[in-house]
Amino acid sequence: MAILDSAGVTTVTENGGGEFVDLDRLRRRKSRSDSSNGLLLSGSDNNSPSDDVGAPADVRDRIDSVVNDDAQGTANLAGDNNGGGDNNGGGRGGGEGRGNADATFTYRPSVPAHRRARESPLSSDAIFKQSHAGLFNLCVVVLIAVNSRLIIENLMKYGWLIRTDFWFSSRSLRDWPLFMCCISLSIFPLAAFTVEKLVLQKYISEPVVIFLHIIITMTEVLYPVYVTLRCDSAFLSGVTLMLLTCIVWLKLVSYAHTSYDIRSLANAADKANPEVSYYVSLKSLAYFMVAPTLCYQPSYPRSACIRKGWVARQFAKLVIFTGFMGFIIEQYINPIVRNSKHPLKGDLLYAIERVLKLSVPNLYVWLCMFYCFFHLWLNILAELLCFGDREFYKDWWNAKSVGDYWRMWNMPVHKWMVRHIYFPCLRSKIPKTLAIIIAFLVSAVFHELCIAVPCRLFKLWAFLGIMFQVPLVFITNYLQERFGSTVGNMIFWFIFCIFGQPMCVLLYYHDLMNRKGSMS
């Protein structure tokens, strides 16, 4: 009871002795001295005669600091006293004895341990203010451990399933027509350049230019489709040709559209500024056709030099992740797909189980594909060509809606869509909603071409899958605007990982197997 009635502090003096300082009396003196603009801890007090006994100067300094912290309620017991007398000016000059006195005073039972209201780190008000680096490291460790166990279990159960002809087989030699078709695609940019050269020299009119560009772009698509359908080529070879075909088509459209716009601006500026002119450069077109962009412009931001060591490291990563992607396909995806049934036929629970089992390896393959192409390959190409603008993607994994995902994950295509589809539709007085639908329609057509033509199977699964994104865009945008929550991100990941891609893989595989079975 004596301690409760009269809280005190035992301090260590410089000569090694000890003194007892009454904390309550010091606080009363502090309040009286503050009212008279003084910091006196000694004087006369009619109510407490013993207050005439003053405290040592160094103790008074530390008492002032603690009393102020106690009054403000903002001090952290553990953190405020690390480092001795740093809280007071020149506190370190007191030597080791002063630091011992601080520690002795701070951890006295009479000193308050709770000075302000605080939330738990995982409470709803404080959870997003904390650093979760440790939990992230834990998730990485658990992910590595779980997947390592699954890989070992798979190898023990099924053995090594990757065949020796995984990278190259004799069948690849039969795909030489597709290889020749890839090389011959360079004819179409030359044809587009010739058209622009003719219109520059006033040999043809604008309607003829538009008609010729339409013929060139249509032929550029139909010719590879015909070659792929006629040749009994491997699926990977067909997909490669169709992807290259789509890239060249998008570049040709951008070249024609941008050249038309520059030509229009130059013609309009002739009256006001004769120095503004339109020119055609084969060098700029050739650079554009190999540059990692789909939007044509006469010049691009360039980097200063080529970092050869950096390119070598990125190329090594490309080989490693491509091999890892092939390992997952051969060891996991192919066995799961072969041992499954058509998802639209048979037991519903069985179909759900197969889709869920396929979702994880399919996600890993997709992430590896994204990393290999959009980060490694496009950056390697940009480095070799000194291409400066390397925003090939944004943080699409944080997308709050499906619309945000489509705007962030593939920046070259997004910029092309905005530049040559979306805003031209708006300038033509087309409603915004219809312009979005048109953009998704173009994307759906090319997704279907890249998958259906190599499979020689036109079931429109890829087309419908892309068009199904349109209502999801409006739904997730509404949820984001109405509630401001991350439910849109959850819906995106569910469609992306669980429902969408695994379902399309199963649908195309079984339809392809059924077609081959009926042909044999």
Swiss-Prot record:
Pfam families reported for this sequence: MBOAT
Membrane-spanning parts: 126-146, 176-196, 207-227, 233-253, 276-296, 317-337, 365-385, 434-454, 457-477, 487-507
Pathway: Glycerolipid metabolism; triacylglycerol biosynthesis
Signal peptide from the UniProt entry: none
Membrane topology: Multi-pass membrane protein
Disulfide feature: none
EC supergroup of this enzyme: transferase
Function field: Major contributor to triacylglycerol (TAG) synthesis and oil accumulation in seeds. Catalyzes the acylation of the sn-3 hydroxy group of sn-1,2-diacylglycerol using acyl-CoA. Can use palmitoyl-CoA and oleoyl-CoA as substrates. Can use oleoyl-CoA and linoleoyl-CoA as substrates. Has substrate preference for oleoyl-CoA compared to linoleoyl-CoA. Has complementary functions with PDAT1 that are essential for triacylglycerol synthesis and normal development of both seeds and pollen.
Name of the molecule in the record: Diacylglycerol O-acyltransferase 1
Organism: Arabidopsis thaliana (Mouse-ear cress)
